[in-house]
């Protein structure tokens, strides 16, 4: 086999990216008014990477998160997971098996304990724990992100904002998703708690191989991610490697409106 043939063969058998957005645009219609919030977005999201999305209000960040999370479909273009268009895969299946979104409002079941919230997520999605019972798996997950058994068995209404955020993360992880998305996850948290949440996101990407995508206005949070995506006027205008020295990064990544 020649080197050219080998290269072609390797390219043909290469695994598709985890998630690809191809020429994605999204338009909202209200009466006679149509507003396009995303315009021709092309990007690939990979496993083991922590992404942040910065941009002014109205730039399309939350819309992008909704499309990546399978909560909506683009007006034009395609969103594909592991080489399959999400509409072909099925949005409900994608959300149940592959992607989970943590919203600004955690949407926890407030009449349940932290532990019950996590086990309920597994029951709803039909997730099977890798070992032991769902309860045991939920306790392990909660412990892995800093919530001990005593905290796990408390009603979520009695937990702090940071603890509730951790429960929301554990609930998403309980279904062993490939992609974890979060919308302004540290906006209402104190600095120490916020940094603890960022530590969890980094661990999920770097130690567990998850793809983590976080919409934020925080430049400090973005500086700890692997890749910073900047949306302006509906276009993905910058892709910044945060491992580069700050002085080498393009301008416009402060995250201010």
What are these regions (language model features)?
Residues 32, 85-100:
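ABC ATPase NBD coupling module
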Residues 69:
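Helix-to-loop junction immediately C-terminal to a conserved catalytic motif
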Residues 77-85:
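Conserved ABC transporter NBD signature motif
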Residues 112-121:
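Short coil-to-helix segment of the ABC ATPase nucleotide-binding domain corresponding to the Q-loop/switch region
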Residues 131-150:
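Conserved ABC ATPase "signature" region
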Residues 155-159, 163-165:
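Conserved ABC ATPase signature
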Residues 176:
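Conserved catalytic motifs of ABC-family nucleotide-binding domains
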């Amino acid at each position: 086999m020649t080197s050219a043939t080998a290269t072609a063969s390797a390219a043909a058998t290469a695994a598709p990216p985890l998630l690809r957005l191809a020429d994605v645009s999204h338009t909202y219609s209200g009466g006679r008014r149509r507003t396009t919030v995303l315009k021709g977005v092309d990007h690939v999201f990979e496993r083991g990477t922590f992404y942040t999305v910065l941009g002014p209000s109205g730039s399309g960040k939350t819309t992008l998160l909704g499309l990546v999370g399978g909560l909506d479909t683009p007006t034009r273009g395609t969103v594909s997971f592991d080489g399959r268009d999400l509409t072909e895969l099925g949005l409900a299946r994608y959300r149940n098996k592959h992607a989970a979104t943590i919203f600004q409002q955690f949407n926890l079941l407030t009449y349940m304990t932290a532990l019950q919230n996590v086990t309920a997520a597994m029951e709803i999605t039909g997730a099977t724990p890798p070992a032991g019972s769902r309860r045991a798996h939920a306790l392990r997950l909660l412990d892995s992100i800093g919530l001990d058994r005593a905290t796990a068995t408390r009603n979520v209404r009695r937990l702090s904002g940071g603890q509730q955020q951790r429960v929301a993360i554990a609930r998403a992880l309980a279904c062993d998703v490939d992609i974890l998305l979060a919308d302004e996850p540290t906006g209402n948290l104190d600095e120490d708690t916020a940094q603890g949440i960022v530590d969890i996101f980094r661990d999920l990407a770097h130690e567990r191989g998850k793809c983590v995508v976080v919409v934020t206005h925080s430049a400090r949070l973005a500086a700890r991610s692997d890749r910073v995506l900047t949306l302006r006027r509906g276009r993905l205008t910058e892709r910044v490697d945060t491992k580069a020295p700050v002085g080498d990064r393009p301008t416009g990544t402060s995250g201010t409106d």
